[in-house]
């Protein structure tokens, strides 16, 4: 609490300093407060940003988000360059006004709550998460579709930067209760049955007694299991749809045509230390079972180890492919797809494949065409 109060004080001091030049009015005898240096002003904004890069929402969150934005706006261009987390406000991720947060009241008796981890990339949020929400609303016109994000840190980012308010799970469920919703279906856009899905279920079940019925749907890839060779129908459907979209986006006639051209498709997922990481091995087994020999599954986190970039690169090279198409195995092509996969800098998957000279990566002369997430491709709505 003391730190939160300090952050708010810093914000007020910074904004006041910028607008008054830290001087008193003419005729006043109070001593002038020394003006902040550019470095101090930038550091104060970094402190304000750090205060809202948290997973817990508190009574101070709204004020903290507003204070951070006001402090940022009060900086000069030169001062903004000194803010270590400057991209928090400065990075252009698209037009937030095109996104519908779906936080309206007047829900009715039946609600379909679409729960996503979330993304602060505006274009990805509109295309991927919004794509799923709109498809579900079209499929179930008698139900009111609403949104919730599980990542408070992302909710705060969007609120501070764009002034867009998105409900977290508790807010969305309480909104449903307050609106007299009787039947609620919770549809996660999470890819797999991991730690985040477990937490989602736990939060939802705390409200279960306040509805006549509550159904919590499975994530996109369905049940996990423990055997990497045992694959459910959901994974088969996702594999077929995702590969078909990748082939279409590449402008190829078929996956076999890409194979004949020496091209592999590499899907990059997130990865997890949760026991559900066997899902990625199951997806690789599914690709092989379908005869998709030139399709490989990797993860940012390299968990399981067989999905780490060096291992995937070895597998692609050993299979004799010299060209690679990178695609996100994620419902949302947000931060990971843009920064960990497609960015042309050391440590990314693009760089990892291109740097050694063994491979050509789609878009290597410019920027990698990372493709949309599975949400925008409506893969999730085909399952």
Name every feature range the model reports, one short phrase each:
Residues 3, 72, 331:
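Short, glycine-/Ser/Thr-/acidic-enriched flexible segments
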Residues 17-21:
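C-terminal motif of bacterial Sec signal peptides marking the signal peptidase cleavage site
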Residues 34-97:
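Beta-rich interaction/scaffold domains
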Residues 89-325, 330-383:
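Extended amphipathic ligand-handling, pore-lining, and cofactor/metal-binding catalytic surfaces
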């Amino acid at each position: 609490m003391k730190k939160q109060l300090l952050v708010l004080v810093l914000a007020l001091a910074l904004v006041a300093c910028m607008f008054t030049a830290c001087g008193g009015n003419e005729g006043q005898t109070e001593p002038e407060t020394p003006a902040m240096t550019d470095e101090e002003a930038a550091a104060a904004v970094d402190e304000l940003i750090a205060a809202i890069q948290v997973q817990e929402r508190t009574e101070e969150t709204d004020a903290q988000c507003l204070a951070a934005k006001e402090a940022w706006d009060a900086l000069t261009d030169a001062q903004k360059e000194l803010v270590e987390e400057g991209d928090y406000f400065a990075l252009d991720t698209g037009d937030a006004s095109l996104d519908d947060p779906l936080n309206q009241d007047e829900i009715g008796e039946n609600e379909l709550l679409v729960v996503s981890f979330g993304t602060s990339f505006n274009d990805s949020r509109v295309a991927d998460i919004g794509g799923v929400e709109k498809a579900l609303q079209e499929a179930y016109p008698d139900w009111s579709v609403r949104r919730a994000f599980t990542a408070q840190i992302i909710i705060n980012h969007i609120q501070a930067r764009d002034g867009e308010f998105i409900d977290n799970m508790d807010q969305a469920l309480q909104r449903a209760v307050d609106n007299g919703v009787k039947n609620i279906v919770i549809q996660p856009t999470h890819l797999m049955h991991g730690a985040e899905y477990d937490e989602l279920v736990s939060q939802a079940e705390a409200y279960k007694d306040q509805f006549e019925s509550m159904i919590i749907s499975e994530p996109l890839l369905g049940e996990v299991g423990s055997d990497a060779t045992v694959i459910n129908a959901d994974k088969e459907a996702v594999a077929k749809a995702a590969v078909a979209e990748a082939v279409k986006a590449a402008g190829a006639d078929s996956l076999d045509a890409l194979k004949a051209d020496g091209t592999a498709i590499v899907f990059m997922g997130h990865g997890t230390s949760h026991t559900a990481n066997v899902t990625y091995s199951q997806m690789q087994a599914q690709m092989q079972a379908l005869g998709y020999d030139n399709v490989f599954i990797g993860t940012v986190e390299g968990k399981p180890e067989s999905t780490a970039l060096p291992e995937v690169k070895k597998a692609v090279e050993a299979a004799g492919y010299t060209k690679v198409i990178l695609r996100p195995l994620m419902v949302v092509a947000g931060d990971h797809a843009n920064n960990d996969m497609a960015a042309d800098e050391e440590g990314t998957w693009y760089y990892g494949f291109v740097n050694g000279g063994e491979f050509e990566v789609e878009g290597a002369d410019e920027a990698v065409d990372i493709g949309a997430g599975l949400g925008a491709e409506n893969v999730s709505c085909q399952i």
